[in-house]
Amino acid sequence: MLLATGEALRGERVLLVDLDQQGDASYSLVSDYDPSKTSYELLTSESVQVPAVATPVSGYLNLDLVPASLTLERVEVELAGVLDAQFILSDKLEAVKDDYDLIVIDTPPSLNVIVSNALTAADKLIIPVQADIYSFKGMATLAQRVKAIQRRSNPRLSICGIVLNRYNPRTNLSKAITEALNEVAEQFNTKVYRSTLRDATAVREAQNAKQSLFEYAAKGAKVTEDAKALLNEIEEDLKNG
């Protein structure tokens, strides 16, 4: 969500597609939306296209959201046996790519057909990792999935880097995880972004207030400066291809 809101505030036309059934991004951006117009319908109904489920986000001139739904948990079953199911999202985003400067896809942590759709549709991948030991579980499997997608369905997919989230520089654990992340980055043939997002109350307060971190914590919170620095790094990667 940080990338989508940050770029929208900088004047880019942005579409955020929330594919995580927890819907954290959706909850943080909109108070209410039509439960029949979500990313679930986008993935499971052949006739539903992006404009039918994209919701303008209040407070932004140029940010649209395809919200998540709890019914996303049924996608795996409903798309079982569907020919070329991993291309559904790619085909539908292709139809609106000229309407936006940037399309951001928020995915669940599990490796399923939803994530395969996202990886097949994406040009670039940014991997967020929380500063705890459990976040490293499944990273090797993700690396294998990415390589398989690059080989079979999306050769243009590249990995921009890994973002360390909820970082506390005062703990030995966070320092150890930072060192371990460099080894993880080698698996993906990528880098760890220099800018980290520290663990801060302002992040959760911003979500509860349904504001972006840039708006809510503009009062001087250090995590806002983290976010701006990270956004600048990511922007540079996007511009350089």
Where are the language model's segments positioned?
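P-loop NTP-binding core
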Residues: M1-G241
